Amino acid sequence: MNKIISSFILLLIAVSVFGQSKIEYLEYDLKNGMHVILHEDHSAPVVTTAVMYHVGAKDENPERTGFAHFFEHLLFEGTENIPRGEWFTIVTSNGGSNNANTTDDRTYYYEVFPSNSVELGLWMESERLMHPIINQIGVDTQNEVVIEEKGLLVA
């Protein structure tokens, strides 16, 4: 009986793996070196702009950790063209949502907007990359936020 059940489960796994259609995408490098993966999915009228940086906790001094996560937070503080505290306001007032996370080997930011706002998502991520403003008030604010988050994880 166990052989029959095991065989059936194996068959289901095989059917689900081989039955999946190939996800089509374009992949290329821009002149500035940025690697782009572009995928169209018309199942919902939204666009996601996602940027992944190949930097994370692995790049830190093991005796002083937390900087990658701290910088993830710091890059929401504002840019030359997005005033401090306005990042989330711009996203939500345009019907969007966003978030970020950091792992050992990467830092990932994304925005999801209605599909007619692809330019806004691209502009915001280019602002984060090219024109961030890092000042003492942002450092102090995000330091407190990260400390509070760490406390929540420990509790």
Question: For each of these PLM feature ranges, what is it?
Answer:
Residues L11:
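Acidic, glycine-enriched active-site microenvironments
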Residues I5-S7, F18-F88, Y110-F113, S117-S126:
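His/Glu-rich zincin catalytic helix
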Residues Y53, T79-E80, E86-A155:
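Acidic/histidine-enriched segments that form metal/cofactor-coordinating
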